[in-house]
Amino acid sequence: MAEITASLVKELRERTGAGMMDCKKALTEANGDIELAIENMRKSGAIKAAKKAGNVAADGVIKTKIDGNYGIILEVNCQTDFVAKDAGFQAFADKVLDAAVAGKITDVEVLKAQFEEERVALVAKIGENINIRRVAALEGDVLGSYQHGARIGVLVAAKGADEELVKHIAMHVAASKPEFIKPEDVSAEVVEKEYQVQLDIAMQSGKPKEIAEKMVEGRMKKFTGEVSLTGQPFVMEPSKTVGQLLKEHNAEVTGFIRFEVGEGIEKVETDFAAEVAAMSKQS
């Protein structure tokens, strides 16, 4: 067995753009033959995947699955809406989802490691970067889910509710984006931040501080209702709040998770004309 030196790994990284561990593995399998390692990496798609790794994957799918009292929600990203609809990409996301449910895996790094070889092969086949971005689990007496297309997914856990009610609550969460279950759940940090914003607005209107503070107190009650599930008007019957709906059914929501594709990812918009102009200057 040839010695796999650091300089050899470094050279392979520079020539392929692949990660250090991938290069070391390829060299070990090729018994230190760098040309054979490169050939094997090309065949496996590792080089193509490495080149795509820097591309922003902000599109993709949200998947949900419930098994009894346990549910998983998963986001898998690609670069375009076209690939998000690809059968191979969808099958890959479903396979990751099934594994997460079966193994109750909530550590995304574990999923990434488990499916890295399949991901690399899919990147080579499809030609876009693919990323298993996040996964979360929810447990409860009654679970419900809702998918708005493939871009928004929701899991809801409740007590004392039937499946239809939980489904309707999940639809509401998808549409209204609550951040907390009840107004009293809104964190002190969020309340303080909003209070300062509203106080600044009130003070700018020229009101005395005492009057401004009273105005803000009223606004804060409205704010905590707006960002909490039970304080929001129910989307299917806006004359009542979700809290009132739950009370009518003697039910309680114990948790919810809402994922939307690409949340928090800054998608780079390419100016094609500018890109061509820049390339022409380099040539």
UniProtKB/Swiss-Prot annotation:
This is Elongation factor Ts. Heterotetramer composed of two EF-Ts.EF-Tu dimer complexes. (Microbial infection) In case of infection by bacteriophage Qbeta, part of the viral RNA-dependent RNA polymerase complex, the other subunits are the viral replicase catalytic subunit (AC P14647), host ribosomal protein S1 and EF-Tu. The lineage of its organism: Bacteria, Pseudomonadati, Pseudomonadota, Gammaproteobacteria, Enterobacterales. Changing H148A: At least 100-fold decrease in affinity between EF-Ts and EF-Tu and only small amount of GDP exchange activity. The keyword Protein biosynthesis applies. Belongs to the EF-Ts family. GO terms for molecular function: guanyl-nucleotide exchange factor activity; translation elongation factor activity; zinc ion binding. It is found in: Cytoplasm. The keyword Acetylation does not apply. Its main location: cytoplasm. Pfam families: EF_TS. Changing F82A: 2 to 3-fold less active in promoting GDP exchange and 6-fold less active in binding to EF-Tu. InterPro entries: EF-Ts_dimer_sf, Transl_elong_EFTs/EF1B, Transl_elong_EFTs/EF1B_dimer, Transl_elong_Ts_CS, UBA-like_sf. Associates with the EF-Tu.GDP complex and induces the exchange of GDP to GTP. It remains bound to the aminoacyl-tRNA.EF-Tu.GTP complex up to the GTP hydrolysis stage on the ribosome. Changing R219P: Resistant to toxin CdiA-CT-EC869, partially resistant to toxins CdiA-CT-NC101 and CdiA-CT-96.154, but not resistant to other CdiA toxins in growth competition experiments. Resistant to bacteriophage R17. In order to produce high amounts of bacteriophage Qbeta RNA polymerase catalytic core, a fusion protein consisting of tsf-tufB-replicase with a cleavable linker between tufB and the viral replicase subunit is frequently used.
